[in-house]
A protein has these predicted regions:
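C-terminus-biased signal that marks the final domain/tail of proteins
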Residues: 1-95, 104-106, 209-246, 259-403
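Amphipathic, alpha-helical segments enriched in basic
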Residues: 42-46, 147, 191, 195
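Internal mixed beta-strand/loop scaffold within catalytic domains of large alpha/beta enzymes
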Residues: 87-192, 335-340, 347, 351-354, ...
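Amphipathic repeat-derived elements
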Residues: 133-141, 250-252, 256, 266
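Structured soluble/peripheral alpha/beta segments that form catalytic or ligand/cofactor-binding pockets
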Residues: 154-163, 167-172, 177, 218-254
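Helix-start/capping segments and mature chain N-termini
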Residues: 158, 165-223, 279-289, 293
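Generic secondary-structure boundary/loop-capping signal
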Residues: 162, 204, 371-373
Length: 403
């Protein structure tokens, strides 16, 4: 588990140094898993390191400085730390379900945003930074000296975030899209050979630098026009009045602007639907169910309702329900969730609710979730939510069907 996660403040190098010094052991455990996963996919470590160094230009100097800080703090070589950051999404892609009720479709007239974070497990996840063959999820608070404050969820020891909220009232999430191209033999190999971008790192950049959803999307778009995402997938940004969804594959990009309407994404493209796999039943079921739930209470969507939707077991409980369950650690199942309620008048008072563990368990126990606004400080966060213990207690594949 992670012992000192994770409030980071100051310069990017200092933020990285803090992470490296606090999580050196955990980062090493994740690196072991990272290289083992890539090995099983047929990658050669030296070739990947070489490509990682060549891809350094994908990151701005602030990000490079943060990675250097992590490397120094954890006493890990910079090339390996850089490569881990660049290609993390290739080894451990985000699955996930995202829903948003934008503007007037929210009960307060402002946006409500939800993401369930789903991931596969691996028999390489066996260190203290893991539990039941899954990465431990923790709450992170980032306060860079020249950017917005961000609260979100991350895997222990990983700098990129799964989903988060900024003090400008911008919410964000990501998910992979299962495409015909991705299923073809050798496509994953291409993700290393080309300069490719990590969605989770991109949304963090958008949250730190963007003052609204469109601006956050504009911040990440120049890079996407030059280089594809590491795997096909979506990025979702939302503020009080507007949502922006970016779909990207290796050669295609599409964007949807959402105003006073509902939207959702599972692991299937909507705009680039000709690329989607027809046999991905889970993504189809979850996407349809998200729209059913949102349409039924359009204009009355609240944080409490989104939390309820996060626990939804229709089409399951199992891999086809929004709260996803499995019978083997290798299946894609829900590990954490976040619901964000934007305050358009006072963005710093926007609220985020985070559940660590299986949503149907964690949302029902105060020990496993937190609801706060953007003024949260280190003393406001329960130790179990910072060190991963709450996640370990409330991660299970057994469905919780009690009221």
């Amino acid at each position: 588990m992670a012992h000192k996660l994770l409030f980071c403040k100051g310069s990017y190098y200092d933020m990285g140094l803090n992470q490296g010094e606090s999580l050196g052991y955990e980062i090493r455990q994740n690196l072991i898993a990272f290289w083992e996963v890539l090995k099983t996919l047929g990658y050669d470590k030296n070739e990947v390191l070489e490509q990682g160094i060549k891809s350094e230009s994908l990151y701005e100097q602030s990000r490079v400085g943060e990675i250097a800080g992590i490397a120094d703090g954890a006493r890990i070589g910079y090339p390996e730390m850089l490569t881990y950051n660049i290609f993390h999404d290739v080894a451990f892609p985000e699955e996930c379900t995202v829903m948003m009720a934008v503007g007037s479709t929210g009960a307060t007239g402002d946006t409500v945003f939800m993401k369930n974070s789903d991931k596969v497990g691996s028999d390489t996840y066996t260190g203290e930074n893991t539990y039941k063959n899954k990465e431990v999820n923790v709450v992170v608070v980032l306060e860079p000296e020249d950017g917005n404050k961000v609260i979100g969820v991350a895997a222990a020891g990983v700098t990129a975030i799964k989903m988060g909220l900024s003090d400008r009232g911008v919410a964000a999430g990501t998910n992979i899209s299962r495409t015909v191209e991705l299923a073809k033999r050798g496509v994953e190999k291409d993700s290393i050979k080309i300069k490719a971008l990590d969605r989770a790192a991109l949304i963090r950049d958008g949250l730190i630098k963007g003052n609204n959803a469109l601006e956050a999307a504009q911040i990440v778009m120049p890079g996407l026009l030059e280089n594809p995402m590491s795997t096909p997938g979506n990025m979702e940004f939302a503020d009080a009045r507007e949502g922006v969804i970016i779909e990207g594959s290796y050669k295609e990009l599409a964007m949807e602007i959402v105003r006073d309407d509902i939207a959702a994404r599972s692991n299937r493209f909507v705009l680039l639907k000709e690329l989607a796999r027809d046999d991905d039943l889970s993504s189809i079921c979850r996407y349809i169910r998200c729209h059913q739930l949102l349409e039924e209470i359009k204009g009355e969507v609240t944080m409490d309702k989104m939390i309820e939707f996060s626990m939804d077991h229709v089409n399951g409980p199992g891999p086809n329900s929004i709260c996803r369950h499995g019978t083997h650690f290798s299946e894609e199942t829900s590990l954490s969730a976040a619901v964000m309620e934007i305050n358009g008048r006072e963005p710093e008072k926007s609220r985020i609710a985070i559940a660590l563990g299986k949503p149907c368990h964690a949302w029902k126990d105060k020990e496993a979730h937190i609801i706060c606004d953007m003024t949260i400080g280190p003393k406001d966060l329960a130790e179990g939510l910072r060190n991963g213990e709450a996640w370990k207690k409330f991660y299970t594949e057994e469905p919780n069907i009690r009221d």
